[in-house]
């Protein structure tokens, strides 16, 4: 059943395209927007446009940052431990580790994991950019790379692939400790568990 308004139905269709949003939820969101003051709708529209126009990827770690703030705040900070790089799948996973307040090193965001079934290979994620941060035969300063990917089949496959590439570079390659349920997503794991996983990391 559709509303007798093309504009409203179009908005519902657009909301329904979002991950985790079914049509009923999309209808509730659209009706909420419809009954809010026009200024609220304008602010939402501006925020949507701004995130597409003003958010870029840090040229060093590939994390998200604002235009004009590259490198990102973490890469630019002199307080971070530059000898350690924690590799994560997404910016959301990076944020999960930051919330613990325990990890003080740098990050590298892959923006995905290797998944042959989905047609995603090493060239489709930020592997080359990671290797470029640890040049062979040069004093990059990096002493350890921590593989902190989600405990899924794809995450494990990606970790094994990265370990094979990184070990010959003469650095320590470690992995966050087990304790996170298989198939779980790091963004939903509590901070205490993430902290223990990072502190108890093991050599790959």
Swiss-Prot record:
The keyword Zinc-finger applies. Residues 83-181 form the Toprim domain. Keywords: DNA damage, DNA recombination, DNA repair, Metal-binding, Zinc, Zinc-finger. PROSITE patterns: TOPRIM (PS50880). One of its GO terms (biological process) is DNA recombination. Disulfide bonds: none annotated. A zinc finger (C4-type) spans 58-75. It comes from the Bacteria. Pfam families: RecR_C (PF21175), RecR_HhH (PF21176), Toprim_4 (PF13662). The keyword Transport does not apply. One of its GO terms (molecular function) is zinc ion binding. InterPro entries: DNA_Rcmb_RecR, Rcmb_RecR, TOPRIM_dom, TOPRIM_RecR. NCBIfam families: recR (TIGR00615). Belongs to the RecR family. May play a role in DNA repair. It seems to be involved in an RecBC-independent recombinational process of DNA repair. It may act with RecF and RecO. This is Recombination protein RecR. It comes from Chlorobium chlorochromatii (strain CaD3). The gene is recR.
């Amino acid at each position: 059943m559709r509303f007798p308004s093309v504009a409203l139905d179009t908005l519902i269709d657009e909301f329904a395209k979002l991950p985790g949003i079914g049509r009923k939820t999309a209808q509730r969101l659209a009706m909420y927007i419809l009954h809010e003051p026009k200024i609220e709708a304008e602010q939402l529209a501006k925020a949507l446009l701004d995130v597409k126009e003003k958010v870029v990827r840090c040229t060093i770690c590939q994390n998200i940052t604002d235009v004009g703030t590259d490198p990102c705040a973490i890469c630019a900070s002199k307080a971070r431990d530059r000898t350690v790089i924690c590799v994560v799948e997404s910016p959301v996973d990076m944020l999960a580790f930051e919330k613990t307040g325990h990890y003080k090193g740098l990050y590298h965001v892959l923006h995905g994991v290797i998944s042959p079934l989905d047609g995603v290979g090493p060239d489709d994620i930020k592997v080359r950019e990671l290797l470029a941060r640890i040049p062979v035969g040069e004093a990059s300063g990096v002493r350890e790379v921590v593989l902190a990917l989600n405990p899924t089949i794809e995450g494990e496959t990606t970790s094994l692939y990265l370990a094979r590439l990184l070990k010959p570079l003469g650095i320590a390659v470690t992995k966050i400790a087990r304790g996170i349920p298989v198939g779980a997503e790091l963004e939903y794991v509590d901070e205490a568990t993430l902290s223990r996983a990072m502190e108890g990391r093991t050599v790959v």
